[in-house]
Curated annotation (Swiss-Prot):
Residues 1-47, 183-277, 336-430, 461-694 are annotated as: Disordered. The lineage of its organism: Eukaryota, Metazoa, Chordata, Craniata, Vertebrata. A motif (WLDD motif) lies at residues 155-158. Residues 685-694 have a biased composition (Low complexity). This is Nuclear cap-binding protein subunit 3. Residues 15-36, 236-264, 387-404, 501-517, 563-595, 605-618 have a biased composition (Basic and acidic residues). Residues 477-496 have a biased composition (Gly residues). Residues 126-187 are annotated as: RNA recognition motif (RRM) domain. Associates with NCBP1/CBP80 to form an alternative cap-binding complex (CBC) which plays a key role in mRNA export. NCBP3 serves as adapter protein linking the capped RNAs (m7GpppG-capped RNA) to NCBP1/CBP80. Unlike the conventional CBC with NCBP2 which binds both small nuclear RNA (snRNA) and messenger (mRNA) and is involved in their export from the nucleus, the alternative CBC with NCBP3 does not bind snRNA and associates only with mRNA thereby playing a role in only mRNA export. It is found in: Nucleus; Cytoplasm.
Length: 694
């Protein structure tokens, strides 16, 4: 880089301009070298010479809104005010012998369009600035320009707006045809000064004519040969001068008019409209980029106070900051609910996304920030009732309808003061909001699939099985400790076999009736053999004073059922003798009944009474065990495995009972031997008893 710069400095230019350029380059290189001793890239050196030309207005957010016109979307693309179009029009007029009025101002405007851009800074040729629209709405402005339908409107304040077209040709036509040049004293002065120029020019012509005459006279004196020719030439010159003097005032008039109008257009002066609107004086001019809405214009708008603010549901009057803030929070909450409850078709991609529809047809531009509408609050926050006192309501129905325009700009002005122009759109807007915020519940039921239904059924079955398997021992047994071993065994069989139901059997009678009918034989399974003490206690039963009797569910009912089914008259059945001894034991009761009265008259002896007292608790225990044993046999049918386990215990009890019976028989025989009258009968009884014992 240093070598290149040195080469640039050493180049010698021939012209002075080249020298100045080389000197400027060498000076800039020297400054760069002095400031930066190290090598510097070209881009960094050029940054120092870049000027920053940005205003603060450009940094502010664009708060302009567009209110579109449906009728302004068509463009012909033909410039009617162009020079070619005007010449074609004149040719047609001559062909049909029609004298067209030439409008030089249109030609001047068309030809001077580039000059307008140079003379007017930041001009927008496609837009016109319209002032004096104090009581006009958006539709009124569109109706005023119905011959030249605009594309959209940009409201600036209550009294002015920008009317925008899609091309600059239509805007210039509207400006020239709908407005006229402003009345000024300069126009009259120019008109009065131009006739005074005419006699001056005629005098000059006459003077020249007189001088010519003098010269001709001198020439005639010298030679009088060409008198006629000279006279003809003089006449022709005079005629030419007169014709020129007659044409000059017309040209000056035309140029003066065009020049005045040209000056007014170049100065961008407001031009009054040809026809007023409802008595309002309207003015038109070209719009510029500086014609923008100021911040806080909505808060200062008197139109909103008079006709209602569409940004806040069409409320009239002065709206407090707290009321505006609450309105914004409600609107935000409503939008959040709307996004949380989308339609089912939106998630599936069947329906297009929802767009706001209203008569103003706003373009989706960034909204004006809420901070512009709010000022610093005073101490404390006002109540809603206090804020409502300040607000003047149009009517109660408009309050319930909700906001007319959610994305409204400074003002939508839909139809002006007449509220009937946008009622249909507002009703459609509210209905669409309700449809979005509250989706139908019937559609949500259709989203369930067959796999979900199968899964729910499987879960219900699994839960029922878990409840059955997690049941306690009492639910499987079906009775308490005093309910008997038969109820316990049956309860286990039922709990292990039945899987379809989870009902708990609490009554032994139901089990016994099922066993009678034989319904449980198919579902029953062999009982599981348990260890020692628990099996003996379950089969032999518990004492009546056992503390576990309280826990039993229906012990009394089971005893009553056993007593009803089988009378407890037989002692041997209560003692629980083995089955092969039952026949011999049951065959003796009728003979015992015959001698029952004799034994009651004689009374027991001391030994017999002592043995009887000792046998009472054992007989009670054996009787209770016999009762439970009978229940076990009636309820469970055949239990071969249980009898094999208890055969040793039964043999021991049987041996003890036989010894006691033999002792009692011996005592009876010794007592009966002392009675001679009854010796034969006693001997028979004794023989029978010995045979039975053997």
């Amino acid at each position: 880089m240093a070598a290149v710069r040195s080469l640039r400095v050493s180049v010698k230019s021939d012209s002075a301009s080249d020298r100045s350029e080389s000197d400027s380059e060498s000076d800039s290189d020297r400054d760069a070298r002095e400031a930066e001793p190290m090598e510097v890239e070209e881009g960094e050196v050029e940054l120092e010479s870049i000027p920053v030309r940005r205003s603060l207005k450009e940094l502010l957010p664009d708060t302009s809104r567009r209110y579109e016109n449906k009728a302004g979307t068509f463009i012909t693309g033909i410039d009617v005010t162009s020079k070619e179009a005007i010449e074609k029009k004149e040719k047609r007029a001559r062909r049909f012998h029609f004298r067209a009025e030439e409008n030089l101002t249109q030609k001047d405007v068309v030809l001077e369009r580039d000059l307008l851009k140079k003379m007017i800074p930041k001009v927008r040729l496609e837009a016109l600035h319209m002032s004096g629209v104090d009581d006009m709405s958006t539709q009124d402005v569109f109706g005023y320009f119905k011959e030249y339908p605009p594309a959209h409107i940009e409201w600036i304040d209550d009294a002015s707006c920008n009317v925008v077209w899609l091309d600059d040709i239509t805007s210039t036509r509207a400006l020239i045809n709908l407005s006229r040049m402003p009345d000024k004293e300069e126009v009259t002065n120019t008109d009065s000064s131009k006739p005074s120029e005419l006699p001056v020019q005629t005098q000059k012509a006459r003077r020249s004519r007189g001088s010519d005459d003098d010269d001709d006279d001198d020439e005639e004196e010298e030679g009088e040969v060409d008198d006629d020719d000279d006279d003809d030439e003089e006449d022709e010159k005079a005629r030419d001068i007169e014709d020129e003097t007659e044409k000059k005032p017309q040209e000056t008039r035309e140029t003066s008019l065009s020049q005045a109008e040209r000056d007014s257009l170049l100065q961008n002066e407001p031009r009054p409209t040809v026809k007023p609107f409802k008595g309002n004086k309207l003015f038109l001019r070209f719009a510029t980029h500086d014609d923008k809405k100021e911040l806080g214009a909505a808060r200062r708008s008197r139109y909103y106070m008079k006709y209602g603010n569409p940004n806040y549901g069409g409320m009239k009057g002065i709206l407090s900051n707290s009321w505006k803030r609450r309105y914004h929070t409600r609107r935000i909450q409503r939008d959040i609910l709307k996004t949380k409850k989308p339609l089912i078709g939106d998630s599936m991609g069947h329906t297009p996304p929802y767009t706001h529809r209203h008569s103003a047809d706003l373009v989706n531009l960034p909204e004006e920030p809420i901070e512009e509408e709010e000022e610093e609050e005073e101490d404390g926050e006002e109540d809603m009732d206090a804020d409502d006192r300040v607000v003047e309501y149009k009517d109660r129905g408009e309050k319930e309808r909700g906001p007319r325009l959610v994305e409204g700009g400074l003002r939508s002005r839909l139809g002006g003061p007449s509220p009937t122009s946008s009622d249909s759109d507002e009703m459609d807007y509210d209905l669409e909001l309700k449809m979005i915020s509250t989706p139908s519940p019937k559609k949500s039921m259709k989203m369930t699939m067959y796999a979900d239904e199968v899964e729910t059924n499987l879960r219900s079955l699994r839960n029922s099985i878990r409840t059955e398997s997690s049941g306690s021992v009492k639910s499987r047994i079906g009775g308490g400790g005093g309910g008997g071993s038969g109820g316990a065994v049956e309860g286990r069989g039922e709990g292990g076999s039945s899987k379809s139901t989870s009902e708990k059997v609490t009554d032994v009678r139901q089990l016994l009736e099922e066993k009678r009918q034989g319904l449980s034989q198919q579902r029953s399974r062999p009982p599981v053999a348990t260890s020692g003490k628990t099996d003996v206690r379950q089969r032999l039963g518990k004492r009546p004073h056992s503390p576990e009797r309280r826990r039993s569910v229906s012990p009394v009912i089971s005893r009553k059922t056993a007593s009803r089914r089988e009378p407890l008259s037989d002692v041997r059945s209560r003692l629980g003798v083995a089955k092969h001894d039952n026949r011999s034991l049951f065959s003796e009761p009728p003979k015992d009944k015959k001698t029952g009265g004799l034994w009651s008259r004689l009374g027991p002896s001391h030994k017999d009474s002592g043995s009887g007292d000792e046998d009472k608790p054992s007989s009670r225990a054996s009787s209770s065990r016999g009762i439970r044993r009978r229940k076990d046999e009636d309820s469970d049918g055949v239990e071969d495995e249980d009898e094999e386990d208890d055969s040793h215990l039964q043999k021991m009890w049987g041996a003890m009972i036989k010894q006691k019976e033999q002792q009692s028989n011996k005592m009876k025989k010794s007592r009966l031997d002392n009675l001679p009258s009854l010796q034969i009968e006693i001997s028979r009884d004794g023989s029978n008893g010995s045979d039975s014992d053997s």
